[in-house]
Amino acid sequence: MAGDLRQELLAYLHELDIRPVCAEHPEVFTVEEMMPHVQHLGGAHSKNLFLKDKKKKGLWLVSVLHDRQVNLNDLAKKLNLGSGNLRFADEASMLEKLKVGQGCATPLALFCDRGDVQFVLDAQFLEGGYERVYFHPMTNAATLGMTPQEFVTFLKKTGHDPIIIHFD
């Protein structure tokens, strides 16, 4: 399934005239496992969190620079949800909405979402002067990179205007 979705994603990117670079690597489940395989790729690498609110009415996919620590209480306040109202969503929700499972959370899966997931992006991806930004392409056995401008084009075409947050 991941292979088919990856091909669908690559075809979608091609339709948008986005020509990403892709690096294959062993399957990884954490940023710490991933970095030795991709640190040679210059640019911004990501850590992605799939979250829900306390009342289970909202879902958020959050992409931050790979070495950031995210305080969920602080993030909830920045999203005007009130402290203590964000928590990790279960894998079943991620599979239903984004078609990827644990260890594969990626904003590139937003092309599968039908408007149920809000996307939060670390401002540094756009303001940090990076030549490329990197995410998993529907599988945690590869990393795909594109320019920040191409990434924004992708997001907007999927109907996801990113909520840009400064985590500094």
From Swiss-Prot:
Xref: SUPFAM superfamilies: YbaK/ProRS associated domain (SSF55826)
Gene3D superfamilies named among the record's database cross-references: YbaK/aminoacyl-tRNA synthetase-associated domain
Disulfide bonding pattern of the chain: none
InterPro entries attached to this UniProt entry: ProX/PRXD1 (IPR040285), YbaK/aa-tRNA-synt-asso_dom_sf (IPR036754), YbaK/aa-tRNA-synth-assoc-dom (IPR007214)
Segment forming the signal sequence: none
Stored Pfam families: tRNA_edit
Domain of life: Eukaryota
Similarity comment: Belongs to the PRORSD1 family.
Protein name (Swiss-Prot/TrEMBL): Prolyl-tRNA synthetase associated domain-containing protein 1
